Amino acid sequence: LALLGLRRVEERVRGFLEFLASEYGQPCEQGLRLDLRLTHQDLAGALATTRVTVTRVLGQLREEGWLLLDDRRRLVITPLPRR
């Protein structure tokens, strides 16, 4: 619930993924792999935003190199520092 208090949706998405990585992430060569089945709609519902917004933010995080997809399309959170 504390994540919903963050103003920018980008911060909420990043914070939620960091939480999931800290709780459920499995170490891999690139960072922490999330072996969870989450749709963009699942993330949107958890973060009180829209699926379209989640898709846009995830794309931005991938462009920054903070978020990767592995060969099985699982999310990998890289150890890059936060901005």
What are these regions (language model features)?
Residues 22-83:
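Phosphate-/nucleic-acid-contacting segments
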Residues 14-22:
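Amphipathic, well-packed alpha-helical segments that form the structural scaffold of globular domains
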Residues 1-14:
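A small-molecule sensor/coupling module
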